[in-house]
Amino acid sequence: MAKAVRCYCIYGLGGRWWSAGMEDVLAVNLRKIKGVICPPTFQYGHWQIIVEAIKNSPNDIHVVAAHSLGAVRATQITDYVKVDLLVLYDLAGGAPSKLGKNTGKCIDIYDTIPDLVPEWRVQAVKGHEKKIERWYSQHGHTGQDDSVPLMRRVEAEVMKLAA
């Protein structure tokens, strides 16, 4: 039997107000992929619920996609459990955890309009640097999660896991 792909999306600091695309663009399309389970998008402060959900399904494939401060919290999830694919939409609002053995692949979608805090780009512990793939966009911080072209790229990565 094929493993389920469990996708967890997380809003940024402004919740749905600033990150509606995490639900309205990304999550709704991930739910259309056969074999993907994607619950409603989480508030950034609820990241520990995702940790517990992953602990309760250790044999499944896990994807966490998050925007802004939610992306910071997404990196913290990997401090506790394994995440096969971590997608960070313009991480901001705090210093992320360094990625290591609990991270399969990380896509860091970095928006350059404007480049608010470049030192907050996600990093990996020594020996895990190649797990981070950097994508660049120019949608603005609050527009990145609404981008259909970016969503299609993320969707393609999830489809590989669901195949």
Where are these regions (language model features)?
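Alpha/beta-hydrolase-fold catalytic nucleophile elbow
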Residues: 89-90, 109
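Short, structured coil segments at secondary-structure junctions
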Residues: 26, 81-82, 102
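C-terminal catalytic-base region of ester-bond hydrolases, centering on the histidine
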Residues: 13, 98-163
